Amino acid sequence: MTDNGTPEPTAPDTIVLVHGFWVTPLSWEKWVERYEDRGYRVLTPTYPGFEGGVEALREDPSPIEELTFPTIIEHIGGIIEELDKPPIIGHSAGGVLTQILLDHRYGAAGVAIDSVPAEGVRVTPVSQIRSLFPILKNPANRHRAVGFTPEQFHYAFANTISREESDEVYERYHIPASGRLVWVGATANFTPGHQENYVNFSNEDRAPLLLIGGSEDNIMPPAVNQSNVKHYRHAKSPTDHKEFEGRSHYTVIGGEGWEEVADYALEWAVEHAKRPAA
């Protein structure tokens, strides 16, 4: 009971983790184990067509080529609809998907980690341009699944760890990404009308949101994350921001000390997802 005699709010028992581009739900494996050890049910929904996993998508990337933001939202949203409004935690493209899902009234709270920018975020640092250049250098990549080389992955994702360690991460997790969706994100602010990555930043019915970034992230640098946060400045629903020093795009969710980020995200999400007791 609380001090005024009302029942304590109930905390959620299920967490949904949404992966980003260039990886699959396997990228959450450490977080899943940690959260399950704490008694939570953890779901890691994949994108439509990704059911075969890393090796299958490397051999046949056609499901990647066919992706759209709406089909991903419909797929993951359908899974969340069957749950009792869980917290949603997303990384990279999973971060902007989390923002879109909250805007569509899915989830009781959301954490967007190293988020791909939503439509309207116009900051484009040099390191981000360099990271995405392998995809954006050729307009024909809009119709392809495009991967990174190990060298490109090290710069874009894992620049705070050794090349040897980065190559191990690459071998375990890396798959091609949808060139189309990368281009959607890159051109959204120059295309008339709302695009697939649109979020209503002033949505009064949105659940609480935390945006997390890494100070050394090259592909989604701090300036991008900070600009994304500022777009929520007029929102009535809680919107918080946390930046972790010394962390790159990968080492926010993996690498030494990843537990600090995982625990912070979980504690924030669970606290803000609590509902009044029945």
Question: Where in this protein do the model-derived segments appear?
Answer:
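Active-site glycine-rich loops that stabilize anionic/oxyanionic intermediates
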Residues: 20-23, 92, 215-216
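Flexible "cap/lid" loop of the alpha/beta hydrolase fold
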Residues: 107-143, 183-190
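Conserved alpha/beta-hydrolase
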Residues: 36-59
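Conserved alpha/beta-hydrolase "acid-adjacent" motif
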Residues: 218-227
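Short beta-strand/loop motif that positions the catalytic acidic residue
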Residues: 205, 211-213, 217
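Catalytic active-site module of serine/aspartate enzymes centered on a nucleophile-bearing elbow/loop
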Residues: 238-278
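Conserved hydrolase catalytic core segment
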Residues: 87-121
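Helix-rich cap/lid subdomain of alpha/beta-hydrolase
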Residues: 128-176, 180-181
